[in-house]
From Swiss-Prot:
GO terms for cellular component: chromatin; nuclear replication fork; site of double-strand break. Residues 121-130 have a biased composition (Basic residues). Residues 550-563 have a biased composition (Low complexity). It comes from Schizosaccharomyces pombe (strain 972 / ATCC 24843). Residues 211-593 are annotated as: Interaction with mcm complex. InterPro entries: Mcm10 (IPR040184), MCM10_OB (IPR055065), NA-bd_OB-fold (IPR012340), Znf_Mcm10/DnaG (IPR015408). Required for DNA synthesis. Required for entry into or completion of S phase. Involved in DNA replication and seems to participate in the activation of the pre-replication complex (pre-RC) and in transcription elongation. May play a role as key coordinator in assembling the replication fork. Proposed to function at replication origins following the binding of the mcm2-7 complex prior to the recruitment of sna41. Probably is required to stimulate phosphorylation of the mcm2-7 complex by the dfp1-hsk1 kinase complex. Disulfide bonds: none annotated. Keywords: Cell cycle, Cell division, DNA replication, DNA-binding, Metal-binding, Nucleus, Zinc, Zinc-finger. This is DNA replication licensing factor mcm10. Self-associates. Interacts with mcm2, mcm7, him1/dfp1, hsk1, pol1 and abp1. Associates with the mcm2-7 complex and the dfp1-hsk1 complex.
Amino acid sequence: MHDPFIAEENDLDLEEKRLQRQLNEIQEKKRLRSAQKEASSENAEVIQVPRSPPQQVRVLTVSSPSKLKSPKRLILGIDKGKTGKDVSLGKGPRGPLPKPFHERLAEARNQERKRSDKLKTMKKNRKQSFQRKRNILEDGKSEEEKFPMKCDEIDPYSRQAIVIRYISDEVAKENIGGNQVYLIHQLLKLVRAPKFEAPEVDNYVVMGIVASNSGTRETVNGNKYCMLTLTDLKWQLECFLFGKAFERYWKIQSGTVIALLNPEVLKPKNPDIGRFSLKLDSEYDVLLEIGRSKHLGYCSSRRKSGELCKHWLDKRAGDVCEYHVDLAVQRSMSTRTEFASSMATMHEPRARREKRFRGQGFQGYFAGEKYSAIPNAVAGLYDAEDAVQTERERKERYKKQRAQAEREREILVRLSKRCCASSSSSSNSNNLSTGMSMRTLGHQYLNLQGSGVKNLHDKGNPTALSKDSEIDSSTKKPSVLASFNASIMNPKSSLPSFSNSAILGTNDAASGTPVPQDTTSTKVSPAVVFTSSPRIFSPQSLRKIGFDPTHSADASTTHSTATGLSRSGSLKNIKFRYEFTESDDEDDLEIVP
């Protein structure tokens, strides 16, 4: 049989030989490596190579990081001084998770319960009235004999100067001490829309000055009340007195420094207004008169109706209210062109400013001025200069047109006088052609058209015509008309002759002396001839000098034979109207009677 122990020994021998062989190989490698190192060291000693020069390192002097920052970036707040090490790009820390609905509902109920308990406690601890007056039997003397008393001091509670004190400082301290005191501006800051809740304290006192008392008023139900305007010489607040409070304090005078105990807050009907009022209706002593104010005054200006303004003001600032000061400034600004447009809203009355800025979301009082730059304000100055130049040119053009109108009037008067002189010089002639040749162009400007002539009056008195000069116009009418029309169409033909009385009339227009007339003459009146004669001038040319050729005379003057030729030598009663045109191209003058 094969022995296992012998086989194991053989394996160990083989393993030992293998390990011995590996050891010999390693030692041989070490020997060769050491020989190579020695050979390399010998070669290095033989060959000498110069080493390259070392690189010079430039040393920079760097200032502190704070000095390298731009000052503008620091001033503007752009550079926060943080570097990359200070900024992390990872997710930020997670905040607390929102509470679930049931927890938030429970907290809301707890807060409401605490608030209701607080209100109950406040109502329980709230005073109904100021403390009662001292018992006279305890002190043995009465202080009412000393008050009201003149003084010149500042009340420590209202912080107002008083000149007359109605109660002593000790009494005021007993009644007001221990309560929360609010001035007008503090209460306006505390009570806010839309809830308008009173201060959540046990007892509070509102101090103010009675600026005005509205007097007795009546509600719709017939109940009486009054309204007191309280002020601290800067802000104002209204307080209404109803019921027993009205019966007790309706006679309070203006200028009295008062203290109100726990007044109710009266909400406005329109919450957007942002103004609330106070209300007193208690039957207890809730109003305390401290003294009379020193600096409260009233405006001395007068309204349009003539009554005094009577608006309250601080006498230290002046005797005129802000509204009338602004009006006076606006009047002075309106006379100066540099303030006419650009600063229109600089001095606007407060009530108008509040009305203009009041709207959706506006609550409270206006507490500042608004300045706005008018667009193109600089360009408007150049436009104003052009407007002045245009106005100057327009006035010069009107002046020229008026001078031209006066010249036309003088020409018309001279032509009328020449007409009268020509008529008087032709009184001895019996030929119509001679009479018409003596007439000037101005006489024909008078638009003599027979029955269509309108008489001109000399100083308001019409020229009288003799009834003896009237001749029946029906005799020989067709032949005369034919001859006159032929003479008009043919200037070389002779005109028929007419009497001088028919041409000139009863009175001479130039001299005013009566002219004898031939009553036996059977010649036709030239008025009948002119009725059917064609017009020499066009209506446009006649209107240019002030006469309307389409005007018809009264029916009572159509049968007159010499009315159309009778003219007055004076044109004083003729009214002219000058009509000017705005256009530079059309500077024609038109005279309309």
